[in-house]
Curated annotation (Swiss-Prot):
Pfam families: DUF188
Protein name per the record: UPF0178 protein NT01CX_0440
Record-stated family: Belongs to the UPF0178 family.
Entries under InterPro entries matching the protein: UPF0178
Organism: Clostridium novyi (strain NT)
Amino acid sequence: MRIIVDADACPGRNLIEKAAIENSVEVIMYCDINHELKSDYSEVRVVDSGFQSVDMKIINEAKENDIIVTQDYGVAAMVLGRKAFAISPKGYIYDDDNIDRLLFERHLSAKARRGGKKTFNPKKRTDEDNLRLYNNILKLINKAKEKSN
């Protein structure tokens, strides 16, 4: 089990690392060459800046029981197919029960934008988001440990 983070624009990295340190879990953070990222705990892997290069690297790297932190529903869907866990930086857990709906809603929003309609921007990050991320990362770590035994 590892925690793999799409770290290009991921708030809450410190909370992810805190949970990982407390549970002795390896963390790998991926970013492209346009982002500078440093960590005393996590392994930082830098990839080319090509279209979806970080996403593709994460999808290919994901293994069963890994925990993937991503905002991208497409990445979440792909890693769920590899029997990994997926969670957003706001702490929402993606699973087989909600990923199809999320992908469909993303499709509808993109279609509306192409048609000239305005869609809503994401809300600002809150302390509740931080707490949800930390608690749900711990929850997924425990689930992954149970599945490994």
